[in-house]
Amino acid sequence: MTISLKTAPLLEVSNLSVDFRTDGGWINAVDDVNFTLAPRETLGLVGESGSGKSVTALSLLRLHDQRNSRLGGSVRYKGEDLFTLATSRLRQIRGHEIAMVFQDPIHTLNPVLTIGRQIEEGLRLHHGLQGREARKRAIELLDRVRIPDAARRIDEYPHRMSGGQRQRVMIAIAIAGDPKILIADEPTTALDVTVQAQIMELLRNLRDELSMSVILISHDLGLVSEFADRAMVMYAGQPVETGPIDKIFDEPLHPYTEGLLSAIPDLDDDLDRLPTIPGSIPEPSRRPPGCRFAPRCTFAQASCVKPQPIMSLTGGRASRCPPRLPTEECVL
């Protein structure tokens, strides 16, 4: 889907930061996150586990424990800053204007309520539907997400369903409020390849039918490349590269993005061993000064020990790593 750059953003995230309270004091988990989301646009958030993708997504709706977290920056939805809204107004937006499909539905769905009751709860809250009217609409939603024999299965409990069916129920709950933005946090986790493809096809169809914007969180670059218009690559709590999905895949600017792409297996390559990125993401309390990727980077320079702001470039792209010459080698 091609999105006009002149379209006013639906969501604007500026200087977002998230800190968590620990026994040793406050620890920063995410910082310097900036992005926009246009109507009907899909943005992919990608990176290794621990890069800050889910922390970023949960913060958009202030879903972190308020006693042990603190948020900085702003998240504006249609001009309203979600970080300063009264709780009553925020509840109106959650699920209705902005909805979320969480990871691992077996731990998200209530095991003692039927799936019908859980869908009807959102219909009552956001549309005022009750009784038979709510049940009828819940069955329609199950049909829409392709649950077979929805009129019978609406009275089943989550444990009676497969992983793929539970994820479809989560999607039905999410779209019950007719949201303008859907946040899908690793929607295909723990599903086999065939079911993954079915879930992504379902999300694609719903996105187009309901004219939703989507924030897709995934470590699967191939999946994001087929679904998203733009991508934001995150590493150690910061975005390191953003841009149109085709540009990021064809001409990555940041060494971390290059490393992720090179680790994707190619059926045409005859390799005994896949390329890997040495090392691992540092813990939040042990992040290096300057470029956080420098200790793992094969192109690290002496200047990388200094803080690296993200630089806006042409074509809607941005990178935290300055353009380098082909002959440059690591000097650290």
UniProtKB/Swiss-Prot annotation:
Example of a GO cellular component annotation carried by this entry: plasma membrane
Topology within the bilayer: Peripheral membrane protein
Cited InterPro entries: AAA+_ATPase, ABC_Ni/Peptide_Import, ABC_transporter-like_ATP-bd, ABC_transporter-like_CS, Oligopep_ABC_C, P-loop_NTPase
Alphabetized UniProt keyword annotations: ATP-binding, Cell inner membrane, Cell membrane, Membrane, Nucleotide-binding, Peptide transport, Protein transport, Translocase, Transport
Organism superkingdom: Bacteria
Binding site for ATP: G47, E48, S49, G50, S51, G52, K53, S54
EC number: 7.4.2.-
GO biological process, one term: protein transport
Domain ABC transporter intervals: 11-261
Main location: membrane
GO molecular function term, any single one: ATP binding
Keyword Transport found: yes
Annotated compartments: Cell inner membrane
PANTHER family per record: DIPEPTIDE TRANSPORT ATP-BINDING PROTEIN DPPD (PTHR43297:SF2), OLIGOPEPTIDE TRANSPORT ATP-BINDING PROTEIN APPD (PTHR43297)
Subunit structure: The complex is composed of two ATP-binding proteins (BAB2_1052 and BAB2_1053), two transmembrane proteins (BAB2_1050 and BAB2_1051) and a solute-binding protein (BAB2_1049).
Function per UniProt: Probably part of an ABC transporter complex that could be involved in peptide import. Probably responsible for energy coupling to the transport system.
Family the entry assigns: Belongs to the ABC transporter superfamily.
This protein's name: Putative peptide import ATP-binding protein BAB2_1052
Species of origin: Brucella abortus (strain 2308)
